């Protein structure tokens, strides 16, 4: 009888690390694997992962980048504690392979996995690698990246995205059947993007009513009241939502998406095959959102506007200058740069590297 293989996923902090990890976890679990997740009790993974019936191990570690003198002074002690906790988790789980998907907790756990001789596979979601993955890449058995040439000796797999996005109809099949005003989807994420919430309503108001697009604007629960007030003040009609349950349908219905440029957003836009105007978050570490967006914008597959250059007048002129055939071509180019088999490929590498 074949022994059941065990995957230990290390990921935490943000959805950009957790959601692709969940995609791979589900893929391997469907193949009969046992999956255990290592995270931080204070991260979103602590509440999200158990909803997927995945057991968790926890370590306590706040990161390698100093947040003040006290944090820097305590870093050696915090690292030592995290190494010890990681050692305990690895001995309890006895994984066949360890998959690091990013976040601070991957550093101590990944180092201990390597020290114990457990196969270590890394996946970097951003176009500029995080500090933990830069260090771990030197000891990992395999390094996978969402964007080309992010880390040395890595394989470009793309980002694992929601299964339904990878199997959407081709852009031509969607754009060619539409008539009337453009459909614009504005995505601010779970926290909302204040810059988009302020500028987009004003920009739409500057357009003649006959040229105004149909707008769906998602802003996060904390920003939704302010957003609705902004549209009311601008006397613009829009569907405003705190969150969107079915992102695949939202992408499928859109001619243009206006959004930030987090790694998963860029990957989802490409997988869906939809035109996008990216406004990178200006305070992202190493300005990685700009580099993420450039992966598509430099190929003519998206538009890129820096937040400091985002004005209502400029955005209004940009929207007025767009038409559906132009957007269809951008969507087609974006789809051509997607890696729809990313989940399958990452799972395949884990299977190849597994050792009982």
Swiss-Prot record:
One of its GO terms (molecular function) is UDP-N-acetyl-D-glucosamine:N-acetylmuramoyl-L-alanyl-D-glutamyl-meso-2,6-diaminopimelyl-D-alanyl-D-alanine-diphosphoundecaprenol 4-beta-N-acetylglucosaminlytransferase activity. Pathway: Cell wall biogenesis; peptidoglycan biosynthesis. Keywords: Cell cycle, Cell division, Cell inner membrane, Cell membrane, Cell shape, Cell wall biogenesis/degradation, Glycosyltransferase, Membrane, Peptidoglycan synthesis, Transferase. It catalyses: di-trans,octa-cis-undecaprenyl diphospho-N-acetyl-alpha-D-muramoyl-L-alanyl-D-glutamyl-meso-2,6-diaminopimeloyl-D-alanyl-D-alanine + UDP-N-acetyl-alpha-D-glucosamine = di-trans,octa-cis-undecaprenyl diphospho-[N-acetyl-alpha-D-glucosaminyl-(1->4)]-N-acetyl-alpha-D-muramoyl-L-alanyl-D-glutamyl-meso-2,6-diaminopimeloyl-D-alanyl-D-alanine + UDP + H(+). It is found in: Cell inner membrane. It holds the Pfam family Glyco_transf_28. Cell wall formation. Catalyzes the transfer of a GlcNAc subunit on undecaprenyl-pyrophosphoryl-MurNAc-pentapeptide (lipid intermediate I) to form undecaprenyl-pyrophosphoryl-MurNAc-(pentapeptide)GlcNAc (lipid intermediate II). This is UDP-N-acetylglucosamine--N-acetylmuramyl-(pentapeptide) pyrophosphoryl-undecaprenol N-acetylglucosamine transferase. It comes from Cupriavidus pinatubonensis (strain JMP 134 / LMG 1197) (Cupriavidus necator (strain JMP 134)).
